[in-house]
Structures are given as structure tokens and as C-alpha cells.
Amino acid sequence: MQQESDRNEQGYSSSPPSSNKQDSSDDTKKNHRREKNRIAAQKSRQRQTEKADSLHIESENLERLNSALRGEISGLREELKYLTCVLSTHQPVCVLGPTKPQAILPHVGSTRYQH
């Protein structure tokens, strides 16, 4: 396909080449341009591959983080069930009576609120 294009370029030139030196110079320029284009395409493919690899690694890291956070959520839900149960069994026997609700403080065991 490229050779056919090259033949067309040579066949439709406005004036015939003046000498072999001119042909050689044109061929050299064409080859140089092709080599630069080949190198640029190779670099582009390399960058594309590196970006895909980087995105794959980032995706795997996010999957692991997501899994860890889902585990933390599950653990916190279990803790909530347990504490709700403890509170419901304690309230009927509590001798202090109802008190004013205090400001909700972060849970001490939660890693989010530790400094």
C-alpha cells in the first residue's frame, strides 16, 4: 500500500527530476521522515501500553481498598447490632433514668477519627 502511494507521488510530480542526485536526496528525506514517523509511532504505542498498565494497577489497588472498606462497614454494622442489643437489655434495668442526649461523639475504635 505504501509502495503504491510512493509510486503515485513520483508519477504525478510536476516536473521530472533533474538528476539522480535529486532522486537520492528525495529518497533520503523520505526515508528519514519514515524513520522519524516509525519512532514516533513506537513511542506512542509504548506510552499507551504504560498508561494501560498504570490504570490496571490503579484499578487493582482501588478494588483492594473497596474490599477493605466493605469489610470495615460489615464490622461496624455487627458492632452496631451488638451495642444496640446491649443498650436494649440495659435500659429496662437502668437506675439512672433518662438523661439529656449529649452531642454525638465519634466512635473511639473507628480509624477515621484517630489522629
Curated annotation (Swiss-Prot):
Gene Ontology MF term list: DNA-binding transcription factor activity; DNA-binding transcription factor activity, RNA polymerase II-specific; RNA polymerase II cis-regulatory region sequence-specific DNA binding; sequence-specific DNA binding
Annotated region (Leucine-zipper), positions in chain: 55-83
Compositionally biased tracts (Low complexity): 13-22
Main location: nucleus
InterPro entries referenced in this protein's UniProt entry, alphabetically: AP-1, bZIP, bZIP_sf
Pfam families named in the record: bZIP_1 (PF00170)
Compartments reported by the entry: Nucleus; Cytoplasm
Keyword Chaperone in record: no
Organism superkingdom: Eukaryota
Region (Disordered): 1-60
Basic motif as annotated region, ranges: 29-51
UniProt xrefs under PROSITE patterns: BZIP, BZIP_BASIC
Biased composition (Basic and acidic residues): 47-60
SMART domains per the UniProt record, alphabetical: BRLZ
GO cellular component terms given for this protein: cytoplasm; nucleus
Tagged with keyword Transcription: yes
Alphabetic keyword roster: Activator, Cytoplasm, Differentiation, DNA-binding, Nucleus, Repressor, Transcription, Transcription regulation
Any one GO BP annotation for this protein: DNA damage response
Residue intervals of the bZIP domain: 27-90
Function description: AP-1 family transcription factor that controls the differentiation of lineage-specific cells in the immune system: specifically mediates the differentiation of T-helper 17 cells (Th17), follicular T-helper cells (TfH), CD8(+) dendritic cells and class-switch recombination (CSR) in B-cells.
Family note: Belongs to the bZIP family.
Protein name per Swiss-Prot or TrEMBL: Basic leucine zipper transcriptional factor ATF-like
Species this protein is from: Xenopus laevis (African clawed frog)
Gene that produces this protein: batf
